[in-house]
UniProtKB/Swiss-Prot annotation:
The MIF4G domain, residue ranges: 53-236
MI domain mapped to chain residues: 331-453
Biased composition (Basic residues): 577-593
Name of the protein in question: Pre-mRNA-splicing factor CWC22
Family per similarity comment: Belongs to the CWC22 family.
Classification of source organism: Eukaryota, Fungi, Dikarya, Ascomycota, Saccharomycotina
Record's keyword terms, sorted: Cytoplasm, mRNA processing, mRNA splicing, Nucleus, Spliceosome
Start-end of Low complexity biased regions: 548-576, 614-626
Statement: the UniProt record of this protein carries the keyword Glycosyltransferase: no
GO cellular component: catalytic step 2 spliceosome; cytoplasm
Length: 637
């Protein structure tokens, strides 16, 4: 494995352990490996494996009722033959975290199983092994595996024989826990069994009835659960449909049903979860490309046909939607505002906001997303105090894809250039909003702060206050050490030299580095200025002197300057004298001369004189001096 691959693996290990790794550095290393490696090398395949794993996890975590169709398409674009182990592990982990999403993941598996049956077979094997393991250890969380199997049966991915055997096992020696699991299973699968396996369904209810009347070991809660199950059955399972309408995505003819029994000898194939070098990598990729074309090609043609029919029928309506008038803009802004204000949580708000642009073209989506981000920031600025509710909304939107990330970067630059238009309270809220995005590492610092030049000429009081609130929010969330680590990253250092002048500093911009040091010291972040202080301290002496003289000359008033020279020669001797006179509007005057020996005298009238004597003499005087005959005096304009 090369140095690049080893470094990339080390960065991934650091990131997985919770330590901060600059995304730009990770991405640059990925690009370097992709450009320098071939598909037959191990480091290239490792990189592709890591990218596949992150892409699968991202799509699974984003999956919900509203976007499941889009998620299916995105997953089929990935090589599921190679990554099916990663996919199953990610789905089972997500389902175990929240059982409410089990029907959604079951619907996702049903669609994938209809095209790639190996996916359905693998998840059933792992769920069965997981149920056995937890049941033998007498763990109640075996219910999660059983519920997932139930919903896969409802989706016809698995035969109902497996769940009937599980129910028989639970009711053979009933306990309070086994009855609770059994009732929960029957609530979810009862309607399916009533329609497809009547005899087995009646047998289960007869067994529950006998337990209710004859078994004295069960508690009142278990009796109550059994009674409620009979009521649910009497009502026709109205609250428990087999498949929700929005999750019924596969036709019966297309579904692949797997036959599995409780005591079957199955393998989990855990080796599919880890990287394995593939000597025929290119050939296998081409094979899956053909599978991908077969799967997505048909759906694309159907979409094109349906879109063509809709365009012929609703051509006028489409034209009206594309005509974005001012009233439509105001209505859209109002909708965004009401959505943000009426949501109970940030997750709910993001979900509703994304649905607003669900059926828009890419160009319309981008424009509307810009308006949406602007409205979120304006809603945040109107609050009396900053609320992290808005920061979390921005964080979730910013991390969705590159388009959203670019919109947030452009919006930050726009607000930085117009921040003087806002009041102090709004300015504080906006600063803390962007500070949260930078602290959460969802917004790239190196792409956002490159427009900031912290100088007296290029900033105003509002922009400096804005910067202060950004840094204060970042320190509250990640601490001063975390902030220093990010600012010390090489990529960030290059792009933030206007904010922290540390590279290429000369006497000409020494005042800028002093201004930056004074600013961060004044807001209590002097620790960030240590390197800048060293840079300023190590400037060459002549450069520091010139910088002071330049600044001093800019404060001077009007001046006059005269010079005269006289030469006289005698035998074997030569003498030259020069006199200068300069008058200023200031009340203080100086006279001086340069030579090898010097004497200084100060008078009470605040005048200085220096004199020297040598073969060549010079004298300088602030007051007008006598000029040799024939010389002219320069008069100030």
């Amino acid at each position: 494995m090369s140095n690049n691959s080893a470094e990339y693996k080390e960065l991934l290990d650091l990131k997985s352990s919770g330590k901060y790794v600059p995304p730009a550095k990770l991405k640059a290393l990925q690009t370097k490996i992709n450009n320098s490696s071939e598909s037959t090398t191990e480091e290239y395949q490792v990189l592709q494996w890591e990218q596949l794993k992150r892409a699968i996890n991202r799509q699974v975590n984003k999956c919900n009722v509203s976007n499941i169709r889009e998620i299916v398409v995105e997953l089929f674009k990935l090589n599921l033959q190679r990554g099916k182990g990663l996919l199953i592990r990610s789905i089972m982990k997500a389902q175990l975290t929240d059982l409410i999403f089990t029907p959604i993941y079951a619907s996702l598996i049903a669609v994938l199983n209809s095209k790639i049956p190996e996916v359905g077979e693998l998840i059933l094997n792992r769920l069965l092994l997981q149920f056995r393991k937890n049941y033998i250890k007498n763990k109640k969380n075996c219910i999660s595996s059983a519920i997932f199997i139930v919903h896969l049966i409802n989706q016809r991915v698995c035969s109902e024989i497996l769940i009937l055997q599980i129910l028989q096992l639970l009711l053979e020696n009933p306990t309070n826990d086994s009855i609770e699991i059994c009732v929960e299973i029957m609530n979810q699968v009862g309607k399916y069994l009533q329609e497809n396996s009547v005899a087995a369904n009646n047998m289960i209810f007869n067994r529950l009835r006998s337990i209710l009347h004859e078994n004295e070991d069960i508690n009142d809660r278990s009796q109550f659960l059994i009674e409620n199950l009979f009521k649910t059955r009497k009502n026709g399972y109205s609250e428990y449909p087999i498949i929700r309408k929005e999750l019924d995505l596969v036709d019966l003819d297309d579904q692949e049903t797997h036959l599995l029994e409780l005591d079957a000898k199955v393998k989990s194939n855990d080796q599919l979860n880890i990287f394995q070098f593939d000597e025929q990598y290119d050939e296998n990729e081409k094979l899956y490309d053909n599978v991908r074309k077969d799967i997505l090609g048909d759906s694309d043609e159907e979409d094109d046909e349906s879109e063509a029919e809709e365009s012929e029928e609703d051509n006028k309506e489409i034209l009206e939607i594309k005509d974005m008038t001012e009233s439509n803009l105001l209505n859209y802004q109002k909708t965004v505002y009401l959505t943000v204000m009426s949501s109970m949580s940030s997750d709910e708000a993001v979900h509703k906001l994304i649905k607003l642009n669900f059926k828009k073209s890419n160009e319309e989506k981008y424009k509307n997303n810009e308006i949406l981000v602007d409205m979120i920031i304006k809603c945040c600025s109107q609050e009396k105090t900053y609320s992290k509710y808005y920061g979390v909304i921005g964080e979730k939107l910013c991390s969705m894809n590159k388009s959203w990330h670019t919109i947030f970067i452009d919006t930050f630059k726009k607000y930085y250039s117009t921040i003087h238009q806002f009041e102090t309270n709004s300015l504080r809220n906006i600063g803390k909003f962007f500070g949260h995005l930078f602290a959460s590492d969802k917004l790239a610092i190196e792409r956002s702060w490159n427009v900031i030049r912290l100088t007296e000429e290029e900033t105003n009081s509002a922009s400096r206050i804005f910067i202060k609130f950004i840094f204060q929010e970042m320190i509250e969330e990640i601490g001063i050490k975390g902030l220093q680590e990010r600012l010390d990253d090489d990529l960030i250092r290059q792009e933030t030299n206007g904010l922290f002048p540390r590279q290429g500093v000369t006497y000409r911009n020494a005042e800028d580095i002093r201004f930056s040091i004074n600013f961060f010291t004044a807001i209590g972040l002097g620790i960030l200025t240590e390197e800048m202080r060293d840079v300023l301290k190590n400037l060459p002496p002549e450069e520091r002197g010139r910088s002071r003289s330049v600044s001093g000359s800019s404060r001077s008033g009007s001046s006059s300057y005269s010079r005269s020279r006289s030469y006289s020669r005698s035998s074997g001797s030569y003498s030259r004298s020069r006199s200068r006179s300069r008058s200023r509007s200031r009340s203080r005057s100086r006279t001086g001369s340069r030579g090898r020996t010097m004497s200084r005298d100060r008078s009470k009238s605040f005048s200085r004189s220096r004199s020297t004597s040598r073969s060549r003499g010079e004298s300088f005087s602030r007051s007008p001096s006598r000029l040799p005959t024939g010389s002219k005096r320069f008069k100030p304009n």
